[in-house]
Amino acid sequence: MTKQPEDWLDDVPGDDVEDEDDEIIWVSKSEIKRDAEELKRLGAELVDLGKNALDKIPLDTDLRDAIELAQRIKKEGRRRQLQLIGKMLRNRDVDPIRQALDKLKNRHNQQVALFHKLEQIRDRLIDDGDDAVAEVLNLWPDADRQQLRSLIRNAKKEKEGNKPPKSARLIFQYLRELAENEG
């Protein structure tokens, strides 16, 4: 009796063991490319950071050296260096790097939001006067009422005389000091 083509498959050596636990997960080529692009973008974000911010991110020495080199390189060499950084990131656990980067971005966003809030309070102090001073004293009991009122009076005079807003800047600086001392 001759073997049929289907029977030939049964005689393959080493095919006797069937491991159901070893399931193969197929990943499309497009998904691999998307992941590589995402890591390259992460590398570009790291390259755009300053030295102080880069020190706050957990990086090994090889990756840090590659990032510092990319910061010094211009044009086409930089593009190639970013590709190398992306390749290096593929072999590393990027979750701690992403978390540290998100933490830096979040801190920056909080600082920007605080500045906007302080600018609104400053503008309200200049426009509303004593009512706004009472609110500031409720927010920051350590605030000096006399100094605030003096700065507000000067800011109003500067605004009416179309002079540079020196006192308005001083009010903002004073409010920022109060906010920093509070937190």
UniProtKB/Swiss-Prot annotation:
It is found in: Cytoplasm. GO terms for cellular component: cytosol. GO terms for biological process: assembly of large subunit precursor of preribosome. Pfam families: DarP (PF04751). GO terms for molecular function: ribosome binding; rRNA binding. It comes from the Bacteria. Keywords: Cytoplasm, Ribosome biogenesis, RNA-binding, rRNA-binding. Member of a network of 50S ribosomal subunit biogenesis factors which assembles along the 30S-50S interface, preventing incorrect 23S rRNA structures from forming. Promotes peptidyl transferase center (PTC) maturation. Belongs to the DarP family. PANTHER family: UPF0307 PROTEIN YJGA (PTHR38101:SF1). NCBIfam families: PRK05255.1-1. This is Dual-action ribosomal maturation protein DarP.
